[in-house]
């Protein structure tokens, strides 16, 4: 079983030093950015630790200065699935880099024996390399579509997060998470959207019912 006295902060520094030796300046800058964002996430969310422990430890230290590298990959799902798409204002390049860098970090942790098994974390990061930029592309497409096609008159309005339940070319069927029972649709969207998005992605926005059926009124987030 891997053991070390190093903290997460020390291991992040070692990881970046190793990457700087092999990467060009532009690529290394992306690594620094993603590790900085990941460190900010860890300090804010303390994955795997409860509020009581958080209160006790923050009196005398930080998450990354307290815990060791075996704690790092526990935050991957929340970092890649929530923090990056919801809390970080960034483009597709940074989203792709988030998956690339965290995947490299997970493999590096296993190679260095700082973590025992990082296969699941590597797979989660691999998915993020594809899905996060794709979700941003869908958001951009829907933003443009809504700007041009948002209805002015409607009878019913649902502001919520919506699971994508069914996809056909140019059409989505959506399931509101909290505000409505059942699936609504078809909701017309650009065909490119239905080529890129996947079932069970989360669309945050407003859907309204018009005389011609359900339509998107606002879209503010798309999350894989």
Region spans (language model):
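OB-fold/S1-family single-stranded nucleic acid-binding modules
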Residues: 208-224
């Amino acid at each position: 079983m891997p053991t070390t006295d190093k903290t997460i902060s020390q291991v992040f520094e070692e990881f970046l030093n190793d990457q700087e030796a092999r990467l060009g300046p532009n690529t290394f800058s992306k690594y620094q950015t993603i590790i900085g964002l990941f460190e900010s996430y860890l300090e804010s969310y303390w994955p795997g630790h409860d509020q009581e422990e958080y209160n006790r430890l923050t009196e005398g230290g930080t998450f990354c200065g307290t815990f060791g590298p075996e704690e790092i990959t526990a935050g991957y799902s929340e970092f890649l699935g929530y923090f990056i798409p919801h809390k970080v204002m960034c483009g597709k390049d940074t989203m792709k880099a988030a998956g690339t860098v965290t995947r490299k970090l997970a493999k590096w942790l296993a190679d260095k024996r700082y973590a025992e098994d990082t296969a699941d974390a590597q797979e989660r990061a691999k998915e993020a390399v594809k899905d996060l930029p794709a979700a941003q592309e869908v958001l951009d497409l829907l933003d443009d579509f809504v700007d041009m096609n948002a209805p002015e008159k409607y009878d019913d309005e649902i502001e919520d997060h919506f699971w994508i339940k069914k996809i056909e070319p140019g059409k989505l069927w959506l399931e509101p998470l909290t505000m409505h029972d059942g699936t609504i649709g078809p909701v017309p969207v650009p065909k490119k959207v239905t080529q890129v998005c996947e079932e069970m992605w989360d669309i945050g926005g407003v859907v309204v019912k018009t005389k011609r059926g359900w339509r998107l009124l606002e879209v503010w987030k798309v999350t894989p």
